Amino acid sequence: NKLLISELSGGMVKRVSIARAIVMNPKYLLCDEPNSGLDPKTAIIIDNLIQEITLESNITTIVNTHDMNSVMEIGEVIAYINNGEICWSGSKEELINNSNTQLNDFVFASKLFKRLKKNQ
């Protein structure tokens, strides 16, 4: 298709941006809020795309996001940064079971994660 950028959907723009970023085979890929403005179904597609690219191309990928669903879907090592300082880092399991009050307030603000924590 020969569409102008203004004619692309939000998900298509994200895919094009990712393709442009990896075309030169970088060692690192930085994704800043890759799911912002996307519906949940498209966000999952973008998460899967990032995961696939990371694994197949052996690219170290850093994802900056506030979307806890994305964090749990694609995060291997997760870091919580507040005011430019890394306050916590660890695995998904460590994130769910942590005792850091500030981190818990942020992570479990979502109803989904409140239920997850309650079931632990």
Question: What is each residue range found by the language model?
Answer:
Residues 96-120:
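C-terminal boundary and immediately downstream tail of ABC-type ATPase nucleotide-binding domains
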Residues 29-32:
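Catalytic Walker B motif of ABC-type/P-loop ATPase nucleotide-binding domains
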Residues 40-42:
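Helix N-cap at the start of a conserved alpha-helix in ABC-type nucleotide-binding domains
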